[in-house]
Amino acid sequence: MDSSKAPVKLVKVTRVLGRTGSRGGVTQVRVEFMDDQTRSIIRNVKGPVREDDILVLLESEREARRLR
């Protein structure tokens, strides 16, 4: 798979919603798109993350289900 042809999206973490995964290794966050400030989605992030971090999304249409 050649990732140089796939468009990437920059997003900013606006809120950390909580930890998920079997051992809590995944963080659920609300992100806001840098190019469209009105659009925000919920994503799962592996690894350390905090508010105001900038993430690169390879797949921008996918949204995570909310935690219960």
UniProtKB/Swiss-Prot annotation:
Keywords assigned by UniProt, alphabetized: Cytoplasm, Ribonucleoprotein, Ribosomal protein
GO cellular component: cytosolic small ribosomal subunit
GO annotation terms (biological process): maturation of SSU-rRNA; ribosomal small subunit assembly; translation
SUPFAM superfamilies associated with the record: Nucleic acid-binding proteins
PANTHER family hit by this protein: 40S RIBOSOMAL PROTEIN S28, SMALL RIBOSOMAL SUBUNIT PROTEIN ES28
Entry GO MF terms: structural constituent of ribosome
Compartments in which it is found: Cytoplasm
Role played: Component of the ribosome, a large ribonucleoprotein complex responsible for the synthesis of proteins in the cell. The small ribosomal subunit (SSU) binds messenger RNAs (mRNAs) and translates the encoded message by selecting cognate aminoacyl-transfer RNA (tRNA) molecules. The large subunit (LSU) contains the ribosomal catalytic site termed the peptidyl transferase center (PTC), which catalyzes the formation of peptide bonds, thereby polymerizing the amino acids delivered by tRNAs into a polypeptide chain.
Assembly with partners or alone: Component of the small ribosomal subunit (SSU). Mature N.crassa ribosomes consist of a small (40S) and a large (60S) subunit. The 40S small subunit contains 1 molecule of ribosomal RNA (18S rRNA) and at least 32 different proteins. The large 60S subunit contains 3 rRNA molecules (26S, 5.8S and 5S rRNA) and at least 42 different proteins.
Similarity comment text for this entry: Belongs to the eukaryotic ribosomal protein eS28 family.
One Pfam family here: Ribosomal_S28e
Gene that produces this protein: rps-28
InterPro entries (UniProt xref): NA-bd_OB-fold, Ribosomal_eS28, Ribosomal_eS28_CS
Protein name: Small ribosomal subunit protein eS28
